[in-house]
């Protein structure tokens, strides 16, 4: 008789993905969790990705100059489409100091404005909430984010540069757009204990 091994004890389920596969409306998350607990297995965690990435915005870097007091820093001006409540210059642009070697004018990037939480720290006991602060004498309104800071990769060598081919089909790059909405991260993920699989008699 063959022996079957079930190495996984839980699975993660995206509600956005489920919505693409069904032709009816899902109940509110709390109600859905209750039903899953009753019929499938225990929901171990509900991950609110929209809250995790809620502050992240897609922006265009319109100016980039060397920091006058630091060789490895740049002073940028970004266009966020006017969505954030932050100080601006006469052209409506926001000043952000950046230490990434790949930052340059005319690039599209991901901005975490003041009062937003760095996604990589979202689940920490004390999440890192950004504020406007001076870096070597120049005020920076938040930060331009690298992959590891967004918890979507390990790269910290440079900030994420968004190109046209990175954008989902049918979506146009717009300044100030929600990073979560553009890339399908306005989602809940349920981590479910796989009782229905791991407790099978075979």
PLM segments and residue spans:
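Phosphate-backbone binding interfaces of nucleic-acid-interacting proteins
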Residues: 6-202
């Amino acid at each position: 008789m063959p022996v079957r091994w079930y190495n996984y004890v839980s699975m993660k389920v995206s509600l956005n993905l489920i919505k693409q596969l069904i032709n009816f409306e899902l109940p509110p998350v709390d109600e859905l969790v209750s039903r899953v607990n009753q019929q499938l297995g225990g929901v171990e965690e509900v991950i609110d990705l929209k809250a995790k990435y809620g502050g992240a915005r897609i922006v265009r870097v319109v100016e980039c100059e060397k920091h006058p007091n630091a060789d490895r820093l740049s002073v940028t001006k970004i266009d966020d489409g006017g969505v954030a409540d932050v100080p601006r210059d006469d052209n409506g642009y926001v000043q952000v100091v950046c230490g990434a070697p790949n930052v340059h004018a005319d690039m599209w990037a991901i901005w975490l404005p003041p009062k937003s939480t760095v996604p990589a720290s979202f689940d920490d006991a004390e999440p890192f909430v950004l504020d406007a602060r001076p870096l070597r004498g120049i005020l920076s309104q938040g930060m331009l984010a690298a992959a590891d800071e967004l918890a979507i990769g390990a790269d910290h060598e440079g900030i994420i540069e968004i190109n046209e081919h990175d954008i989902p089909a049918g979506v146009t790059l717009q300044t100030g757009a929600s990073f979560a909405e553009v890339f399908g991260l306005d989602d809940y993920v349920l981590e479910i204990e796989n009782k229905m699989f791991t407790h099978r008699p075979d």
